[in-house]
UniProtKB/Swiss-Prot annotation:
Keywords: 4Fe-4S, Iron, Iron-sulfur, Isoprene biosynthesis, Metal-binding, Oxidoreductase. It catalyses: isopentenyl diphosphate + 2 oxidized [2Fe-2S]-[ferredoxin] + H2O = (2E)-4-hydroxy-3-methylbut-2-enyl diphosphate + 2 reduced [2Fe-2S]-[ferredoxin] + 2 H(+); dimethylallyl diphosphate + 2 oxidized [2Fe-2S]-[ferredoxin] + H2O = (2E)-4-hydroxy-3-methylbut-2-enyl diphosphate + 2 reduced [2Fe-2S]-[ferredoxin] + 2 H(+). Pfam families: LYTB. Its cofactor is [4Fe-4S] cluster. Binds 1 [4Fe-4S] cluster per subunit. The keyword Transferase does not apply. Pathway: Isoprenoid biosynthesis; dimethylallyl diphosphate biosynthesis; dimethylallyl diphosphate from (2E)-4-hydroxy-3-methylbutenyl diphosphate: step 1/1; Isoprenoid biosynthesis; isopentenyl diphosphate biosynthesis via DXP pathway; isopentenyl diphosphate from 1-deoxy-D-xylulose 5-phosphate: step 6/6. It comes from the Bacteria. Gene3D superfamilies: 3.40.50.11270, 4-hydroxy-3-methylbut-2-enyl diphosphate reductase, catalytic domain. It comes from Bacillus cereus (strain 03BB102). This is 4-hydroxy-3-methylbut-2-enyl diphosphate reductase. The gene is ispH.
Amino acid sequence: MKIVKISPRGYCYGVVDAMVIARNAALDTSLPRPIYILGMIVHNKHVTDAFEEDGIITLDGPSRLDILDKIDSGTVIFTAHGVSPEVKQRAKEKGLTTIDATCPDVTKTHDLIEAKKAEGYHVIYIGKKNHPEPEGAVGIAPDIVHLIEKADDLKTLEIPTDKILVTNQTTMSQWDVQHLMEDIQKKFPTAEFHKEICLATQVRQEAVAKQADVADLTIVVGDPKSNNSNRLAQVSQEIAGTKAYRVADVSEIKLEWLQGVENVAVTAGASTPTPITKEVIAFLEQYDPMNPATWERVRKVPLQKILPRVKVKKEQ
């Protein structure tokens, strides 16, 4: 079996930065305890499990405000997906120490929404409902930001001005966003468009589109909650024309997927730890359909190998 290692794949700079911020927090003895992450720091359970070993508690809930209600003291880390001003204000009112790990690309979108609100615009925001990134973006100006996920959402959308900006969640499929923007332009011809697919998402999607077409199967390594991982599987199927499965790690690979397969493409979401992806590739490289000894699929990567290393500051 030949393995097509799609490149680039895996961690983006925003994810690495967020994890380094959280690791430094875990090592900072001056921070009030306990230390909480408001939702998953990045959408990967292996990462959140590793942080739990570091003493950092990941809390989840329907919204960031709902999660904050569970916290009465300590330190709160805002995730890479960003949060609304209301969440920041609520944390301040509760007397919590806050650390912001928002991805710079997400911050750019927040700044854009604020600037356009000041100019009297309404904003159409393309994103996934119930995902934390759109929650934070809509929360910048909930009175003028309209969240849409698919073309059907446009049918009932009415906006009381011709001053309209269209932007999007950074981890969406660039093809889906383009198609939706074309539909929006037909309904709102005066709209201005500001596509905000982050560069890391874009190049990873384009790599799958260009490199997965030679494979019989694509395996995307990524958490089920990771929107960018799910979009990579979608790109493989819809753009490259190659059947795709998303797995959290090697243990989720089903042997029947590999029957009759000669070429397997492998990629990984932007929040997927590199050792987890390497373990998937190693399994596929040694797999022999005629040798049951090669069929074992057990994740063996220790949690301490998941998180990036950080330098411990020496006391003066």
